[in-house]
Amino acid sequence: MTARLVSILEQLRSIIKRFEVETGAIEKAFVKNDPLAALKLGQARASAMIALGESKIEVSEYAPNYVKKIFAGKGHATKEEIKRMASLQFPKVCFSQTDEADALAIAVCHVHTLKLNANLNRAIKKAM
């Protein structure tokens, strides 16, 4: 497990540097009845947050249902529905795993939310 967490950390450091990442987003932890899965997920999330934090990159967290609602139009979309929507929105991208589509959904949700917040802030300033 340690090697896997180090690998996550190192890969993210490389991506952050290569693509000059300015902002980050992760999904909030959601675990039903599996404490071991919750622990592993928490460790992977920590690796991601450390990589982003080292570079002073702000991290936003989104609830799974919010991501699904923004990306697929319904908050209880299945992994297959997310993958199908990702394929429709990005037809040139081949998603071999549903996790890849999930990651893209989080990124799209983040961009959408940033734009929404910026528009809202402009409207508030204009109204004052």
Language-model-derived ranges and their functions:
Residues 1-128:
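Phosphate- and other anionic-substrate recognition elements at nucleic-acid/protein interfaces
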